[in-house]
């Protein structure tokens, strides 16, 4: 969220952060956004009878603020097909792994346990299934022998802070095109550079 707000401060950035919304009234991100001059709102899921009632309250807020695109960041509740289909191709998420690998939680621990040599993050359009949907962009890093879940997670987070604003910029500029399950238009010059050792 911080990276998106910071990017949107640039005069030539094509998107505006109109609202930061959380289901947790005490979420630290709300205070950060408020200090940055962004409108904030909390919709506490605990006071609603079910997910659909909760999401309809969110929908009213989004319509009130004339929201065009939703960027999920640390939102840990599964959304219903009703909400997702209502925001089809207008709802994106960032996930701390190279999807389709490591859907769900504890991605860094699982990557290390499997001994993978490449890890990273993915921005994708949201589908009703968890961590599914057309992949927009990915950033990859090498996994070091000395990595722990914390060190690996910190380096992936650095990539997230670069990748998410880049993707939002491309969407707001109407640069991306969806063709089946592929997203086209994330040109090679935007791709993360993965440095690998040279072999003799």
Regions found by a protein language model. Give the residues of each.
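Donor/substrate-binding cores of folate-linked one-carbon enzymes
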Residues: 7, 23, 73-186
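Residue-level detector of anion-binding/catalytic polar loops
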Residues: 39, 68, 117
């Amino acid at each position: 969220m911080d990276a998106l707000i910071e990017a949107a401060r640039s005069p030539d950035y094509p998107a505006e952060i109109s609202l930061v919304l959380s289901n947790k009234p005490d979420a630290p991100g709300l205070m950060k956004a408020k200090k940055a001059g962004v409108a904030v709102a909390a919709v506490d899921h605990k006071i609603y009878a079910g997910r659909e009632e909760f999401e309809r309250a969110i929908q009213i807020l989004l319509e009130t603020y004339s929201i065009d695109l939703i960027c999920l960041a640390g939102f840990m509740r599964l959304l219903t097909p009703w909400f997702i289909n209502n925001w089809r191709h207008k709802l994106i998420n960032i996930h701390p792994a190279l999807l389709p690998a490591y859907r769900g939680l504890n991605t860094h621990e699982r990557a290390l346990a499997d001994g993978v040599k490449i890890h990273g993050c993915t921005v994708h359009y949201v589908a009703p299934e968890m961590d599914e949907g057309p992949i927009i962009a990915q950033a990859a890093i090498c996994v070091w022998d000395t990595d722990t879940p914390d060190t690996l997670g910190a380096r992936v987070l650095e990539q997230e802070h670069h990748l998410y604003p880049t993707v939002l910029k491309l969407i707001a500029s109407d640069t991306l095109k969806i063709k089946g399950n592929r997203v086209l238009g994330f040109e090679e010059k935007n791709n993360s550079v993965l440095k690998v050792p040279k072999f003799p």
